[in-house]
Amino acid sequence: YISLIDEVVIRALHPKVNPYRRDISKVNNFGKFGYFLEHLNIVLGSYQRIAGNKYIELNKKISNHLLRMSMSYSNYHADLLPNANMKWSADQAAIIYSLWLFDQNNSTNLSKEISDNWLQYMNDNCVHKSTGLYQTEVMGTKKYSKQPRGCSMAYLIHYMSRFNPQEAQKQWTLFKKHMM
């Protein structure tokens, strides 16, 4: 498995794949590329779990950046792309999962506060009235933003089941009731 996860990291870091178009270890400001960074952070956390600490400094740097971005907004959703106002609940769940994975690997506690704040925000502001499911997008930029969508909910529940299994189970029960 080590050679496989190593190849995944190499491909994810490649300048033709990463949005910075250069060696990511030389990037000083990760900017508003939360969508790429959330997935890279999960890959790096998975690498550490399987193969060791080769990328731990990059994993830590990205984790801290994602945490800062997430905590800087009252809706606790990081920016996902530089020129897009949309903030997807499922992607924020993936960001929090990536922080939780870093915590699991390194005996840290980066994910606790953002997880608690995000869940509180979601429960207070983003519950679809007729289903109880979380809304798809929190900025209201699309006509379907307030509506739960199947693919988005499945993704959100999958990641949330790691950092808050009880809340994920509630959403899963509602998902099966209203989406299946």
Where in this protein do the model-derived segments appear?
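Hydrophobic core/packing positions within alpha-helical solenoid repeats
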Residues: 37-40, 44, 59, 63, ...
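Residues within HEAT/ARM-like alpha-solenoid scaffolds
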Residues: 28-39, 54-57, 109-113, 147, ...
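Extended ligand-binding clefts on enzyme/binding-domain cores
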Residues: 85-180
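Long, well-ordered core segments of solenoidal/helical folds
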Residues: 2-22, 57-78, 109, 113-133, ...
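Alpha-helix capping at helix-to-loop junctions
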Residues: 45-53, 68-75, 104
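Short linear capping/connector segments at secondary-structure termini
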Residues: 21-26, 78-84, 134-141
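Post-signal peptide N-terminal segment of secreted/secretory-pathway proteins
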Residues: 1-52
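Aromatic-lined, polymer-binding surfaces characteristic
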Residues: 30-44, 73, 80-93, 99
